[in-house]
């Protein structure tokens, strides 16, 4: 009797192993012919599929519309050829737009948990894997020539927990990983070529706590890139960043910002840190000229901020309801213009503002700054990259400048901080016509990101 039971058990095990072995079905195809390769009666039964050979956009759409029960699709060994479908051209080596997402039905491949991209893929098209709601595993890290992940390509993949981006990647499109509610780990390969992070790229990734872009060549961070990443407390950016869009860090949990190395950044855009109650300390690069509306509004934990040396204007409501603010370091040689209700809800009499001793009287007589506790400081330790052999002189109603390196721009201010004019320069010598004002301050921005201010 025991012998018979053992035989039956072995037969059952053999049958199970046979079924497992048959789960992964391999089809070799040529571009545009997948529909004729897979028998119609097998389509609904396919769970594990591997393709070899060549495919095109038509084959992706065939999979989307007919192999809806697939859990694993392995296309790592296929080549994608260019084609035209319904009058739309699709490029070679690109996962086509809406590859596995049906826009009219607003559904993706709802059972797809593992997808292996072709190793030759260079671009992942818009909404390619949008709303693949149980997708967990991909081979993104193994794609040696991937350059672009386009808008919405892997958005609302609500089971995706980890993403590893290859070094070849140059651009992450708008909302490419937005609203991936389980995404907690994003790894970027060393020596990354990443230059552009599109708007809303990681918007709503509520389990993402940190991001490190410091090893990339990132230049631009789009609007709302990290908006509503509610536990995101650390984002490291490289010195190459020149632009960060509005609301980029809105409703995150960032606690400290030190952007002193971002020498190409000129503007802190509107509502950039709006509602970030955890933010307590901010250091901005001296290259910043403007802080726009509501940039730090409702940052209730912000206690200290170091303003840039070259700051000209603070926008409306920029620091509204920063109720913990106690120290502002403001080493500018001019008095920055303050917008409407810029410090609304701030107890200005409790805030110490450290300013240059030479311009302290201007702050004391200013309608906006006069309400703060003002303190003169020599700022002897501040470094703004002065070029010692710079020659600036006033002659014949002009300001004449001779520089050791190329100049990016020159701004002329009156002593009260009013900008008289600004000129864009692209050489090492400049003559700027001067208005009738008796005295002026010349602010020179160099192409290397340094700044020099000269009082005449």
Annotate each PLM feature:
Residues 403-408, 437:
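Short proline/glycine-enriched turn/loop motifs at strand-loop junctions of beta-rich domains
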Residues 78, 85, 419-437:
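Glycine-centered tight-turn motifs at strand-turn-strand junctions
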Residues 23-29, 47-55, 70-93, 105-123, ...:
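Structural signature of tandem-repeat unit edges
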Residues 376-396, 404, 450-451:
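Residue-level detector of functionally pivotal "anchor" positions at catalytic/ligand-binding pockets or at interdomain
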Residues 98-99, 125-130, 150-153, 173-176, ...:
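Consensus positions within tandem repeat domains that build extended binding/scaffold surfaces
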Residues 1-23:
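Bacterial Sec-dependent N-terminal signal peptides
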Residues 413-420, 440-442:
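Short, glycine-anchored, charge-dense loop/turn motifs used at functional sites
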Residues 439-456:
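C-terminal tail/sorting-segment detector
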């Amino acid at each position: 009797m025991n012998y018979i039971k053992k035989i039956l058990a072995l037969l059952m095990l053999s049958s199970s192993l046979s079924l497992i072995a048959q789960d992964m079905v391999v089809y070799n195809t040529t571009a545009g012919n997948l529909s004729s390769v897979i028998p119609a009666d097998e389509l609904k039964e396919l769970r594990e599929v591997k393709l070899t050979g060549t495919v095109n956009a038509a084959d992706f759409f065939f999979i989307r519309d007919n192999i809806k029960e697939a859990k694993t699709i392995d296309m790592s060994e296929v080549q994608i050829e260019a084609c035209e479908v319904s009058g739309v051209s699709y490029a070679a080596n690109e996962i086509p737009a809406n590859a596995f997402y049906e826009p009219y039905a607003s559904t993706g491949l709802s059972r797809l948990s593992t997808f292996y991209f072709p190793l030759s893929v260079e671009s992942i098209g818009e909404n390619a894997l949008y709303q693949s709601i149980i997708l967990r595993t991909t081979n993104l890290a193994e794609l040696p020539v991937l350059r672009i992940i386009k808008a919405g390509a892997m958005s609302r993949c609500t089971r995706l927990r980890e993403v590893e981006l290859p070094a070849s990647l140059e651009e992450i499109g708008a909302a490419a990983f937005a609203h991936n509610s389980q995404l907690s780990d994003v790894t970027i390969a060393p020596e990354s070529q990443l230059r552009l992070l599109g708007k809303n790229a990681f918007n709503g990734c509520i389990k993402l706590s940190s991001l490190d872009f410091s090893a990339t060549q990132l230049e631009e961070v789009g609007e709302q890139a990290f908006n509503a990443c509610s536990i995101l407390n650390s984002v490291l950016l490289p010195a190459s960043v020149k632009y960060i869009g509005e609301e980029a860090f809105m409703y995150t949990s960032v606690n400290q910002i030190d952007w002193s190395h971002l020498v190409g950044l000129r503007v802190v855009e509107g509502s950039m840190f709006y509602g970030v109650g955890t933010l307590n300390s901010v250091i901005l690069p001296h290259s910043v000229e403007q802080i726009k509306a509501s940039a730090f509004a409702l940052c209730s934990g912000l206690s200290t901020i170091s303003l840039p040396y070259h700051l000209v204007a603070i926008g409306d409501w920029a620091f509204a309801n920063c109720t913990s603010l106690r120290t502002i370091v403001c080493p500018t040689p001019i008095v920055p213009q303050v917008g409407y209700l810029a410090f609304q809800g701030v107890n200005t009499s409790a805030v110490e503002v450290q300013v240059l001793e030479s311009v302290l009287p201007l702050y004391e007589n200013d309608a906006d700054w006069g309400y703060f506790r003002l303190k003169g400081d020599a700022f002897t330790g501040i470094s703004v990259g002065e070029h010692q052999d710079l020659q600036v002189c006033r002659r014949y109603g002009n300001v004449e400048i001779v520089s050791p390196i190329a100049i990016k721009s020159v701004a002329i201010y009156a002593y009260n901080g009013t900008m008289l004019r600004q000129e864009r320069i692209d050489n090492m010598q400049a003559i700027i016509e001067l208005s009738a004002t008796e005295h002026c301050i010349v602010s020179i921005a160099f192409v290397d990101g340094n700044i020099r201010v000269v009082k005449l």
